[in-house]
Amino acid sequence: MTKGDWEAVIGLEVHAQVSSKTKLFSSSSTEFGAEHNTQVSLVDAAMPGTLPILNYYSIEQAIRTGLALSAEINKSSYFDRKNYFYPDLPQGYQITQFFEPIVKNGRIFINNNKKEVRIARIHLEQDAGKSIHEESKTYVDLNRAGVALMEIVSEPDLRSSEEAAEFMKKLRQILRYIGSCDGDMEKGSLRCDANVSVRPKGSSTFGTRCEIKNLNSICYIMQAIDYEIQRQIEILESGEKISQDTLLFDVSLGKTKVMRNKEDASDYRYFPEPDLLPVEISQDKIDSIRSSLPELPDQKKLRYIRELSINKYDADVITSDKAIANYFEELIKKHDSKLAVTWLTVELFGRLNKAGIDIVSSPIKANALSELLDFIVDGTISARLGKQVFDIMFETGKPASLIIKEQDLKQITDKGQISEIIDKIINDNQDKVQEYQNGKTKLYGFFVGEVMKLTKGKASPDVVNFILSEKLSS
């Protein structure tokens, strides 16, 4: 069999950190980057006699996420203990939701909304701490222990690393739009485990799956899945069997490595958490959260295409990130959508990309660009001068009004003044006027250039064209 005779079957378990200032069962801060073990309560450290107190904000964010993914909200859910030993898990168990998750049966569309990927469940659970390894010692940092995670579990509907990457991008986009997770993979706010197996094309039987743990970038997700697919194909084609293992992806080697044999649910001895009551959610609460959801990216994109006549590519770019969409929305409060698209996606993005920064860090905020567009639209400056002003704004952070005043860039629109300048140019270049009138029409650009030279680019192009064409044809 060749590689084309095999089909990959992939499911993702995504761990999304809830955008909450406190942990799931304690009031400890979740701020990133604090000194080791400075954000640890007695509950987080599992001191005997301490009891968990549920953070209901995390419950609301899980419901919010479920509704954004068109899922069912379980009106009665509860927490369970997942029993295992690990140095950075001080309780000796993790509080999670195994039997009755808060959300089930959702979906995400990928491949231009042509493919549905089913979401089996979303449940809340505690994050573990972090082990820090040095040469002969291992340190444990419990700052992360107890942080609220949403585990978003897909069905095995993905068939390639590209689809897995698109699923992650789409999920991250939705989470950022609704504000339930910041989606920052570099800080570990969003990471995933990939369950990968292969089977002969056309088969409906699942192969033996391996789980690749803790993938924290889109690039690594694709590399790890591609390597694992090829590894499993080679094993099967050599006549051997796949071992159901838990794997780690070695970034430096670009290979997966066995971490341990994969456990089954029975190995964790799940049982209901005795220190927490069931979570009861009313329909009124669900409806209230639903009504607070913002316009989601697919809805926004469709509106831009249908109502604002923006092409699909630009609509995709603008809605790809909530911050970009918000910036654009600010611009179109006062300006034509096509003008806003050009200045956002061409002028601003060009400068941001060159500087290596994103729109959140842009030195030019939406209201500042909107003011610049005001001056272009009302004729105070030309579009050409507008780009010059924009460059200075980007470098200095100064408002357009101040730059125009300081640089004396206000456009000359006085017809009498421009007419006098054109008369002088015509009188000084009679030979070229004769050539133009004899059919050498390309010389028109020469006359425009001379006007701009004498006015330092400040003459209104519309006024120049109107007067110049009239004088050259007479």
From Swiss-Prot:
In its UniProt record, a GO molecular function of this protein is:
asparaginyl-tRNA synthase (glutamine-hydrolyzing) activity
The EC number(s) given in the record are 6.3.5.-
* Keyword vocabulary terms for this entry: ATP-binding, Ligase, Nucleotide-binding, Protein biosynthesis
Q: Does the keyword Protein biosynthesis apply?
A: yes
- Return the Pfam families for the record: GatB_N, GatB_Yqey
Catalysed reactions listed for this entry = L-glutamyl-tRNA(Gln) + L-glutamine + ATP + H2O = L-glutaminyl-tRNA(Gln) + L-glutamate + ADP + phosphate + H(+); L-aspartyl-tRNA(Asn) + L-glutamine + ATP + H2O = L-asparaginyl-tRNA(Asn) + L-glutamate + ADP + phosphate + 2 H(+)
Top-level taxon of the source organism? Bacteria
For this protein, the record's InterPro entries field holds:
Asn/Gln-tRNA_amidoTrfase_suB/E, Asn/Gln-tRNA_Trfase_suB/E_cat, Asn/Gln_amidotransferase, Asn/Gln_tRNA_amidoTrase-B-like, GatB, GatB_C_1, GatB_Yqey_C_2, Gln-tRNA_amidoTrfase_suB_CS
Q: Which GO terms describe its biological process?
A: glutaminyl-tRNAGln biosynthesis via transamidation; translation
What family does the database annotate? Belongs to the GatB/GatE family. GatB subfamily.
**PANTHER family per UniProt:** GLUTAMYL-TRNA GLN AMIDOTRANSFERASE SUBUNIT B MITOCHONDRIAL AND PROKARYOTIC PET112-RELATED, GLUTAMYL-TRNA(GLN) AMIDOTRANSFERASE SUBUNIT B, MITOCHONDRIAL
Q: Which NCBIfam families match?
A: gatB (TIGR00133), PRK05477.1-2 (NF004012), PRK05477.1-4 (NF004014), PRK05477.1-5 (NF004015)
| Record's function text | Allows the formation of correctly charged Asn-tRNA(Asn) or Gln-tRNA(Gln) through the transamidation of misacylated Asp-tRNA(Asn) or Glu-tRNA(Gln) in organisms which lack either or both of asparaginyl-tRNA or glutaminyl-tRNA synthetases. The reaction takes place in the presence of glutamine and ATP through an activated phospho-Asp-tRNA(Asn) or phospho-Glu-tRNA(Gln).
Question: Which HAMAP family is this protein grouped with?
Answer: GatB
**Its quaternary structure?**
Heterotrimer of A, B and C subunits.
| Protein's name according to its UniProt entry | Aspartyl/glutamyl-tRNA(Asn/Gln) amidotransferase subunit B
Which species is this record about? Wolbachia sp. subsp. Brugia malayi (strain TRS)
Gene symbol?
A: gatB
